[in-house]
Every structure is written in structure tokens, then in C-alpha cells.
């Protein structure tokens, strides 16, 4: 029977992954209404900051470091990489494609992070010669193949018996050169957003090491910076103040849901799960978000689904699990080396102790 420490992270991550899948599907629907995607992002980050303020005050007020210029600069960069710029490209890509494609490309995150770690020499290139290294490279390449399939092969639309005839008619009218161009651009924007998120994870790893035990305060400060950054980036599309007044009730509800569940709660749950089980365990739940987004988008929101999205998603998820298999082998090898080293040291100490006792017994009286 599983103990609470074992099943609790599984249950929490399942709920969180399903919620994130639904967030992406709902956000796609909200963007289709015509809201400025960076105004949406600014509201989302502002709501996240407001939600995280009490958590950071109650649990981290005694351990929180002083606000220095360097700390502010670091969190400004963190907000730029992991929130504002990432959302700029990701939400733009989502508006041009679908929730299924967006979640499939996000599943490439571990592989892209590994590739960037190699480029910046955070990951040792010598490790690529091992079995774990070969598996990680294979997984990364398969993920890239899946991304290319998602991008360049849309495929036929799978019929949805629940979709409204008028919606299907409008979708058929939108087919053509412009629609294909938007699809390709959308996939490109999603890949750029995922790369930015990977860069943020590498940067955040160093930031978390520098400021341990302050995940709520750090995320709250990042969200504050990101909300202002998103507001500035929104000017590229519209400078009309009226665009900030959202009257559509559905968009308002989605904005609140995305800020509370998709940003604040997701950050807290993910941070707790990483602390309890590790980042690799958390990465294995990416397909759950993908399946949830697909089902929510197709069955509830009645959006069209394409064959290329399904095939590309399957290839991408296959690459993800090959990569995670390599990570598991690497971890097992590291643990084995540590145990062998510890056993060797213990045997050496016992041997030295035996020799010392033997010498003592041979001393003349």
C-alpha cells in the first residue's frame, strides 16, 4: 500500500496537469474572441501576484532576503524570460494554432532544456557517450521530429459530431494559403516560447540556488515585473485604453481562472512536487496536460482536431519518454557510483582499523 508521501504528489500533479490542459483550451477560446493577448497576459500575471502575496508574507517573511538592486534585476530578467516574452510568443502561437499543438510543443521542454544546457556547457558533453547520454540525445531528436510533424503536416480535419454546422462552415472558409501561413507562424511562435521557458528554467535554477526557501516571494516578485512588461508589450498591437476594459464575461472568467489556477496555483503545486519528487517526475505529467487539452478542446469547446496534431503529439510524447528514460538511467548510475564509493570507503576504513588492531596485538609487553 502506498504511503501518503508517495501518492500525494501523484494525485496533486494529476489534478494540476488536467487543470493546465483546460486552461490552455479556455485561453485559446478567449483569444478567438479578439482580446489583446498581452493585455490578457498582464491581467493574468497581476492576478497571480495578488494571489501569491499572502503566501509569501505568511510563510517567508522571516527568511526573505533584503530587496537589493541585484535581486530586483535578477527577478526582472526572470519575469522577462519566463512570463512576459514567453507569453508574448506562446499566446500569439496559441491564437494561430490549437490547444493540442501548444501542449504538445510544451512537452518538448525537458529535451530543449537539455539541448540548451549543452550549448551553455551546463551539461557535460562527455556524458553523451554513455547509455543515458545516447538515450537523451535520441529523445531530443525524436521530439524535434514530432515538432516538425506538428508544424508542417496539418492533415485532414477529424469530424466532430458536436460541432455547430456554422462553425464548421466558417472553418472551411478560412482554409487556404493564409490559414496555412498562420499555422506555420503559430508553431514557430510556440517553439520560441518553449525555448524562452527553457532558458528561464536554467536561469531560475541558479536563482533558486541563490535564494533557497523563497519560492512564493520569488514568484510573486517575478509576476509583478511581468505584469508591467506585458502591459508595455501590449502597445505593439494596440494603444487604445478602451482595449483594457474587458466586457465579455467569458473572457473575464478565463482571465481569473488562468491567473489563479494556471499561474499562481500551478507554480505552487509544481514547486512543491519538484521538492518532494524531483523535476524528472514532474516532467512525466506533460502528456496528461496534452490529453486533457485535447479532450477539453474537442469534446467541450467543440473545436476542430487535425490528424497531424495527433500524430505529431504521439511522436513528441514518445521522444519525451525516451529522454526521461535516459535521465532515469543517468540518475541510477549516479546513485550506484555514490553507493560504490561509500562502500569502498567503508571497506577501506575497516581494513585500516583491522591492520591497526593487528599491530597493537604484536606490540612487545
Swiss-Prot record:
Segments of this protein annotated with the region Disordered: 339-365
Domain EamA: residue ranges: 20-151, 216-324
Entry keywords, A to Z: Membrane, Repeat, Transmembrane, Transmembrane helix
InterPro entries recorded: EamA_dom (IPR000620), WAT1-related (IPR030184)
TM stretches of this protein: 7-27, 39-59, 76-96, 100-120, 132-152, 183-203, 216-236, 250-270, 280-300, 305-325
GO cellular component: plasma membrane
Keyword Repeat applies: yes
Skewed-composition ranges (Basic and acidic residues): 348-365
GO molecular function, one term: L-glutamine transmembrane transporter activity
Family of the protein in this entry: Belongs to the drug/metabolite transporter (DMT) superfamily. Plant drug/metabolite exporter (P-DME) (TC 2.A.7.4) family.
PANTHER family named in the record: WAT1-RELATED PROTEIN (PTHR31218)
Protein's recorded name: WAT1-related protein At4g01430
